[in-house]
């Protein structure tokens, strides 16, 4: 912005002779397009306006004592100042050890601009720096002052932030000298005490539990006071939740010193009782003494804190596996769930000040793990944003034994964040004041702009990757420096003694007090406390079955809901073809008609909302549905306005949150899992575009959804909709890898189902909603139909199937009634294969009086009792045949084999009919697919043909 006329006139009065001609030429270019002139010249015109001799007919006399002045020196000085802002980080004092500063940018050298200090001394500070701090008179003073701001123990990168307001806010904060805090003596003593607590705790563990893994925080101790300040600021702003995610590095110190986990509890976890039997007995399907538990540095914790009268803030540290960074989207899901008000119909009302996310990353993992980028991409999306996350990279210079030049292609570990326009502060972990200053900036930026902020906390790792590892074999030079380097507490404490804040020897007194406290706690522990804590027992309700939930609805209510779903706001003009399809649902519940899959799903959602349960439904293309069956969000063809029929329901006091997700599996799946954990009152549903793509989120399935309750007692009720079925579309559009979910099925950890009617879908979703926030709750993994089945008449259901009974884990083959006295073969299968068999039977003249068919709609928990009751009614049964369209080494066969074998008599056989073992799930040639499918059907329905016998029978 141009200055006032007097100031501008005074500035332009400095130039004479050939300089004025040069400036006139440059100004003509500037008027045509500012981008045509060099940035330093552009800055002059932006600041001072047009040269005064061009804007006034009067002869302006110089107010300076100087006569002629070389304008190139001025422009060079401006360029140098801008370079300090942009490249100062390359010369910053941010590395406590390691000599990792790297190449200092030549743009910081005076020689690059043909400048000398004498040249800068001739230029008034006001010409090149609008802030002009006290005592800064010349351009040389400006350069030195800005180097203090940009090349000290705290440095900044924000030039990549495109928003002018955000960039100016950071610029003003830094260059007005307000970036670095100046704590009082008492505040410094509190920081020292925290550092001493952390160091003392780590040293006590090191000498007391020699050689045991703990993933020490030493070298990054300043992280703890940084987190302290986040919590304090959050509480002062009445933020209710601070949601934290971090890996194992430093986790025990954070648990002890931030979350307040008792020291004796942590000490007890370092002692192991060999007699404790925690493994299942041979042949048993249950744990004898309890669940699996986890190592001490994976556990999370919660704590409520209060500073003053602003109410309580709950700190939550998420449980975390060793799979680095995958907790990030989980924590974001926690935070969004805490922010959303789901008590009214429509979309939830988000209040970002109710919760804040704090993610602590590793330097190698932040740029190495793709889930980080997936999570950062969520930060600005309406369905996933949490109003800004505070990121801290716990940068210890190494990834296990891997040096940074082998671990990343960028200069800094934080460079990934620049692509998302996230401001970056790098700070030396040996300077606690710079560290807490960085936190204050990050927090205030988040609160003001509702965006992410990243701090690269640069320190080191005192020991190896873990305390049993010897780092000197791979980084001898670095560890020679680390061995000789004092701790941050020592440096800070000695500095306070030198300044007279502490008396001489005061720091040693602080250290001794910490050591005595920890020693007394450990000595005071009883023998039982020193032993390993008792493992928790699996809740008994998980083994009690799932039959107690009522899911049927009376016909009048169902019809009323269906009618409401077909209503539209006045003036809304939907796409005619879509509306015609949806209006067909109007008579779906009348006698003689059937409700298709899309109708059954919509009725389930609507009825769940009517009963007060919020729903969150996300996934790629979920609003319409991959196979165009859902159309749960409609678009006005004239205005583009969106409308969901589920938002128009009457008498609803629960939100319906439906979102098309970004093209991500791991990130989005982790987010939805976290949302489901934090909001147990909500039915959270994630849908894969095709089930085949779900395995891009395999870590979330393995480490969280399937096992979190057994490891950590963390409960989720989320639903996974995975389109699955062989239609000749090749190996990437056929299989949701059912076998993998079944391989992980144990301890009633989740439900795995493959239902074959819209009513079954209706009941299983309503059952899942009924389990919300109860001990019976667990995830549902549901294989869903695709193009060939989703509108198939055989997948439809009559009104009675919705209004009577409930979900059937074992289901009769529709339209077929067996002659049980004559049955010699029992065919059992699941999913699309059973529809294909049903069609083949209808097309045949065969009576099939030798055959009985049962559909296993819920594969886990397996309906063993129901199937056993059926077998008892088949006195002449000779064989049980499992039929599936997947290859023999995939699908459900390897899982159901044991269950089915247990049901056999000595004279009965167990067989399987399937595609042969394959490395890929399906073939890519439609004709070959059809031939193989027909062969399976023929074998299942031909009394003289059979499948392969199960091993052991």
Curated annotation (Swiss-Prot):
InterPro entries, per this entry? 2oxoglutarate_DH_E1 (IPR011603), 2oxoglutarate_DH_E1_bac (IPR023784), DH_E1 (IPR001017), KGD_C_sf (IPR042179), ODO-1/KGD_C (IPR031717), THDP-binding (IPR029061), Transketolase-like_Pyr-bd (IPR005475)
Tell me which EC number(s) this protein carries: 1.2.4.2
Show the SMART domains listed in the entry.
Transket_pyr
Q: Name one GO molecular function term.
A: oxoglutarate dehydrogenase (succinyl-transferring) activity
Q: Which cofactor does it need?
A: thiamine diphosphate
Instruction: Kindly list the biological process annotations in GO that this record carries.
Output: glycolytic process; tricarboxylic acid cycle
**Record has Transcription regulation as a keyword:** no
CDD domains the record matches:
TPP_E1_OGDC_like
Which top class of enzyme applies to this chain? oxidoreductase
Q: Per UniProt, which keywords does this protein have?
A: Glycolysis, Oxidoreductase, Thiamine pyrophosphate
Read off the Pfam families from this record: E1_dh, OxoGdeHyase_C, Transket_pyr
Going by the entry's taxonomy, the superkingdom of the source organism is recorded as: Bacteria
Which reaction does this enzyme catalyse, per its entry? N(6)-[(R)-lipoyl]-L-lysyl-[protein] + 2-oxoglutarate + H(+) = N(6)-[(R)-S(8)-succinyldihydrolipoyl]-L-lysyl-[protein] + CO2
| GO CC annotation | cytosol; oxoglutarate dehydrogenase complex
Can you tell me which family this protein belongs to?
Belongs to the alpha-ketoglutarate dehydrogenase family.
Give the protein's function.
E1 component of the 2-oxoglutarate dehydrogenase (OGDH) complex which catalyzes the decarboxylation of 2-oxoglutarate, the first step in the conversion of 2-oxoglutarate to succinyl-CoA and CO(2).
The record's annotation in NCBIfam families points to: 2oxo_dh_E1, PRK09404.1, PRK12270.1
Q: Note the subunit structure.
A: Homodimer. Part of the 2-oxoglutarate dehydrogenase (OGDH) complex composed of E1 (2-oxoglutarate dehydrogenase), E2 (dihydrolipoamide succinyltransferase) and E3 (dihydrolipoamide dehydrogenase); the complex contains multiple copies of the three enzymatic components (E1, E2 and E3).
Question: What is this protein's record name?
Answer: 2-oxoglutarate dehydrogenase E1 component
UniProt organism field: Oceanobacillus iheyensis (strain DSM 14371 / CIP 107618 / JCM 11309 / KCTC 3954 / HTE831)
